[in-house]
């Protein structure tokens, strides 16, 4: 009886935190609706008139990030003043990305637009929240328009597929996606790589998921439930921008970004410099890999890093 109770309790704990995140997201949208009604706002969701409530939302999520994950953000200085495309690794639950958006707004008063999968826009009751926080579809025209208006635009080429079917090896699941590179070349903007340490240790997907893979490929809906929510250490690293180069092809740019995001968690020593010299990003890479991601990911190590005050 005791063992059974403990098992049930453990299962509940592993699902409570992800469900709590969903609850807070919907609560945030309700607060936005109240704010909109009280202030009789009908402005463009991307307008600065929403900055006051954006700051409130960002402050809440930043406090949550500090308490639950000891969240740190490094490399903000690598973000261009103007437009650019942020390319990042997609965790099982991209809560780390929400932390990044919140801290970026608090530190820089800057709104980064986020490309999301189509299913996100079908979620009930989140229209206002998605608009005010700058979540947009991944259509080429919308991305180009945002970049021409001077926004940072973020995208995870792996998207939902990477969230569901990558694992503790942190392998990228990009397939043949290269739209982000085409947009960057057309808009003549840099691409900035980004990843969060231990994101797969915080939230995971079940390993036996062949059925869910087939289900996703046929429906494009994420039926695989995430679990976890352990208070592991999260550190987001922003790498040095890959500048616009009119002589590079889309395929070469895709591979360049893919190599950076893949190799950053694996390089164990600064003197392994072929990667650094090849892509001329020595300073940024050294900052990112000063404390590398353990491959495969290790939950216990990620938890213990909460007590390690040295910068990773």
Residue ranges and their predicted role:
Residues 1-35, 49, 53, 145-312:
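Non-catalytic C-terminal accessory region of glycerolipid acyltransferases
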Residues 1-103, 108-134, 138-141, 209, ...:
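Membrane-anchoring hydrophobic helices of lipid-metabolizing enzymes
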